[in-house]
Design a protein with these regions (language model features):
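N-terminal and secondary-structure boundary signal
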Residues: 1-103
C-alpha cells in the first residue's frame, strides 16, 4: 500500500509570515503548480455558514486561493451546498443573501 503525504503548517504567525502566506506556501508545496488548470473551471467548495456565526472561511483566504488559481490559468469560482434543514441556507436565493452578509 502506498503512503500518502501529509502537509502541515502551524498557526503561529510572525510579522514576516502571516496565515495567508502560510496557506499559499502549503498549497504550492503540495504541488498545485503541477496541475493543468489552463482554461478549466475550478470549483472551490467552501462553507459560507449562517449570518452571525463565525464558522465560515474568511473571504481573504478564498481570495488568495482564487488569485493562485488564476495565475495558473484557471477559472475559479466559489460554491457551497444548500441545507436540508430549514433556515437561511435552505434555498439558493436566501443562501446567497446570507453569504453576502458574511462577506
Amino acid at each position: 500500500m502506498n503512503t500518502s503525504k501529509v502537509y502541515f503548517t502551524n498557526l503561529r504567525t510572525t510579522p514576516s509570515s502571516n496565515l495567508l502566506d502560510k496557506m499559499e506556501r502549503l498549497v504550492k508545496r503540495a504541488g498545485i503548480a503541477n496541475i493543468d488548470f489552463k482554461n478549466q473551471f475550478v470549483a472551490i467548495k467552501i462553507h459560507f455558514d449562517e449570518p452571525g456565526n463565525l464558522a465560515y472561511i474568511r473571504p481573504n483566504y478564498a481570495a488568495r486561493l482564487v488569485s493562485l488559481l488564476r495565475e495558473l490559468g484557471a477559472k475559479p469560482f466559489l460554491t457551497d451546498c444548500n441545507t436540508l434543514y430549514s433556515g437561511r441556507r435552505s434555498n439558493a436565493v436566501d443562501h446567497l443573501q446570507s453569504d453576502m452578509e458574511n462577506g
